[in-house]
Amino acid sequence: STPLYSSAASDVYKRQALVLLLFYFREAILFRIVGQMIKPSMAFDNFEPPPPPNYKNLNSWAAHPYLKNGPDQLTPNNENLDFFKNAAVFYIHPTGYFGKTWNATIDKDTPHYERTEGMLAGQASAFNASCDIYAPEYRQATFFSFFDETGDGQKALARAYEDVENAFFEFLELIGDKPFFIASHSQGTLHGQQLISKHIDGTDLSKRMIAAYLIGYPILKSDIKKLFKKIEICKSPEQVNCLIAWCTVDEMANLDGESWSWDPSGWKRLNRNDSLFGTNPISWTVDNEWISTEQRNSVLDLDIWDQTIKGLTRKEPSDVPINISLFENADFHVRLSSKGLAEVKGNFLKRFDAVEFGLGNLHVVDYSLFWGSIRENVKLRLNEYLKKQN
């Protein structure tokens, strides 16, 4: 089936937020109910894995310059995009699989692939004015993996990472000597952290990596030097060869509970309430001042609810059109909290159901709240990189 794409406005987030916000409320009764619904039916070692992707094959990519008119190429105003790009981006999509096997197939005629397309529209599209976009479809770990305590979740995440790593090696072959960005969200960011730690940090590739946008998965400040011994964190809007990260919350909210994390010593549980590495996605600094988004018109409106909540039970794709636009006069304020979270406040935010739920976590809009700001920052860092090369 072939989804339809357009650029019309929409205002539906509730169902998507409800599903993704469960990620941050591990101890909640609601999560335990849903968790049992999606818990894999057998141990990882008894589970026959899906066939591995072959990244020489175009069909193993969710986005690729040869895949024309995909959702990653959407723009809010039908902007004409330049054919030639001076950079590439390796985009690692978040979890979209809520099935009862440990790892997803890369079959494109599935609800989880349709959700990948929604993520391409809502996240990867921020890079399409400046970069050739490469996004591997990989055997992502099921959503339940993050909460499993038997070790099977780690194994599922390790299998997913193996695919991402193989795709990255092919990406390097495909782009030649072009500079590149890394961009990721949620599960994708967990894999991105490991990829950069193993294959970019301290190598010549770090000089070609303009920046890494590692969004929506916590990185403890205390783990930065364990993960990245040479690469610096970005402290200004134009800095290059550096790392950017944030997790978005409502004013005064925190991230509670635990998540799996990886560093060169292995896997561990991290407490999300500890101090995190964070960047303000409007000022692109690491200070704690409130910054206004006034008149920036940077917030992306994206309708993909039917691909998320109904996909938990639906066996077939919905073929619902993916629609993006920019909100006008999307005024709110952003600062880094004392714990490194991107904390936001303002009346505009009331339209997002994550705030209305009173949970305070805006994981579902980590990218779309700052879509225009990301887009401009990518241009700025790319131009700065090219100036330095000349």
Give the residues covered by each predicted segment.
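Structural recognition of the beta-strand scaffold that forms the well-ordered cores
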Residues: 88-91, 134-137, 181, 211-214, ...
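Single conserved hydrophobic/aromatic residue that forms the stacking wall/gate
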Residues: 1-9, 13
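Surface cap/lid and interfacial helix-loop subdomains adjacent to catalytic sites
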Residues: 165-175, 198-351, 384, 388
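Active-site catalytic motif of lipid deacylating hydrolases and related acyltransferases
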Residues: 27-46, 82, 92-179, 342-390
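Hydrophobic membrane-insertion alpha-helices, especially the h-region
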Residues: 11-22
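Proline/glycine-enriched tight loop/beta-turn segments at coil->beta junctions
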Residues: 81-87
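N-terminal hydrophobic targeting segments that direct proteins to the cell envelope
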Residues: 22-69
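Gly/Ala-rich beta-loop-alpha elbow adjacent to hydrolase catalytic centers
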Residues: 184, 188, 192
